[in-house]
Every structure is written in C-alpha cells, then in structure tokens.
Amino acid sequence: MIFFTFEHLFNHISFSIVSIVITIHLITLVVNKIVELDDSLEKGMILTFSCITGLLVIRWIFAGHFPLSDLYESLIFLSWSFYIIHMIPYFKNKKLSAITAPGAIFTQGFATSGFFTQMKQSTILVPALQSQWLMMHVSMMILAYAALLCGSLLSVALLVITFQNNISLFGKRKLLLNESLFIDKIQYVNEKNNILQGTYLFSLINFYRYQLIEQLDRWSSRVISLGFLFLTMGILSGAVWANEAWGSYWNWDPKETWAFITWTIFAIYLHIKTNINLKSENSAIVASIGFLIIWICYFGVNLLGIGLHSYGSFILKST
C-alpha cells in the first residue's frame, strides 16, 4: 500500500511540475530572457526528472521486474525518455525545448488518466516476458520512439515556420505586382522603394526566424539519427528475443511490420539528409509522416489487441 501511495504521489507531482515547466517555456518564447524564469525552468526540469525516476524505481521494486510490462508502464517510461531527449537541445537552445516538452506532459497525462486505472496495479509477467531481453529490447524501442517523436516535432515546427515565411514573401510580391498595374511610373517607383524598404525591414525582423529554421533542421536531424540508432538496436534485440521465445527471428507480426515501416520511413529521412541538393523541407515532410507512423506502431497493436505483442496492453489475473 505504501508503494502505491508513493507512486501515486510521484506521478501527480511530476505531472504538475511538467505543466508549470511548459508554461514557463511558452512565456520565454514570447518574452525576452528572464533570469528568474530560466532558474525556475531548470529547477523544475530537474525536479520533474527526479519524480519520474523515483516513480519508475518504486514500480520496479514493488513489481520485482523492470517496469515495461504493459502500456501504462511503457507510457511512464516514454515520458521519462521524453525528458532525457528534451534535455539534449535544452543545453544548446532552450527555445527548442518548448517544442519537444509537450510530449512529456501528453504521455504523462495520458498515463495518469482513468483509461489505465487497472493497469496501475502490478501483475505477474506472462511467460514470454520473463526474460532478460525485456529490459534491452523494450527500453531501446521506447527510447527510439521518444527520440523520433521529438525529432519529428522539430521537423513539423520547421514546416510551419517555413510555410508562414513563404506566405509573407508571396504577399509582398503580389502587392508590388498589383501596384504596378494601377499607378503611373513615378508612383510605381516610389511604391516600389517603400515596399523594398519594408521588405528589408521584414527580412531583418525575421532573421531570428531563419536562424530558428536552421537550428530546427540541425537538431531534428541529430535527434532523429539518435532515435534511428535506438530503433535499429531495439529491432535487432527483439529479433533475437523472438527466436528464443517463438523459434523465429521474424514473423511479420503487426507490431513487427509497423516497426519495419517506421524504420524504413526514417531511413528514407536520413537518406534525404545526405543529399545536399534537396531542401530541408523535403526531409521534414518525411519526418512528419514518420510522426504519425510511430503513434500507429506504438498504440495500434496495443489498443486493437492483435498479434503476438498485444499482451502488453492487458492485465494477467492470477487464478
């Protein structure tokens, strides 16, 4: 009972702190750097990480196995993984973290919702999960999901900012064209100079935006590369585990199939990044597609309850 109380306490404290941290992140995006907010932000992140870590440790001690046996535990570990990945761009550019931070509160909030009430009770592992490969395979896959989701979010942000820039530039050019059709030459020259001056000012104002686009592209590539490495290790370790448990390295189980699709999507992303002739928007589109594919891979099998991996979403009741 005391373990469950501490687990419940750590869960809700971490969720509350993450909510405050994201609010501070959003404030720092609008307002210039404030020392007090930066200090609170750093302390909040450390405290959140400590609470989630304490929750996982308590769950591990109480259950007697690494807490990755069901969907609830994997969501908590995914939230913890989000925090780890979130810290990588934090030390370089704190504003990038405001894009990836909501992933932590989303998974944390979803895990603490009433949907997983029964799963919060630790249960006996099914025979297939009673293996040393549980920690290796599942932890690598969850870390991969966290890294790939964070990198994909950065790519989505890149597309949004780029799209806004294109609309603004198109509006300036269209205005100049319309003016040239309805005014005389002298007025046209004056209007052109005004518009060009405005465009120059517009470029100066949005110089930060272009810098942010470059940073988003660079960090999304780095984080996705890290996630791709974790995903490859997770798939390989899962194949070895499958051979020990079921006598075959690969069975084209729905989970395995979607994991392969995910791996292929991000392999295409990395291949596009090696081509210097292609714009960053091309790879960002692929990463955005990968964002949806990951959620299908992660939740699809568990919620539908199909395939050999579906046991992770159900409770084993002892008789």
UniProtKB/Swiss-Prot annotation:
Q: What does this protein do?
A: Required during biogenesis of c-type cytochromes (cytochrome c6 and cytochrome f) at the step of heme attachment.
Spell out the subunit comment. May interact with Ccs1.
Segments crossing the lipid bilayer: 15-35, 44-64, 71-91, 96-116, 141-161, 223-243, 258-278, 284-304
Q: What is this protein called?
A: Cytochrome c biogenesis protein CcsA
**Location in or out of the cell:** Plastid, Chloroplast thylakoid membrane
The record's HAMAP family line, in alphabetical order, gives: CytC_CcsA (MF_01391)
According to its UniProt record, which protein family does this protein belong to? Belongs to the CcmF/CycK/Ccl1/NrfE/CcsA family.
Keyword check for DNA damage: no
* GO annotation, biological process: cytochrome complex assembly
List GO molecular-function terms, semicolon-separated: heme binding
Arranged from A to Z, the UniProt key words for this protein are: Chloroplast, Cytochrome c-type biogenesis, Membrane, Plastid, Thylakoid, Transmembrane, Transmembrane helix
Species assigned in the record: Fagopyrum esculentum subsp. ancestrale
- Look up the record and report any one GO term of the cellular component aspect: chloroplast thylakoid membrane
Pfam families, A to Z: Cytochrom_C_asm
Membrane topology term reads: Multi-pass membrane protein
Q: Which domain of life is it from?
A: Eukaryota
Signal peptide feature range: none
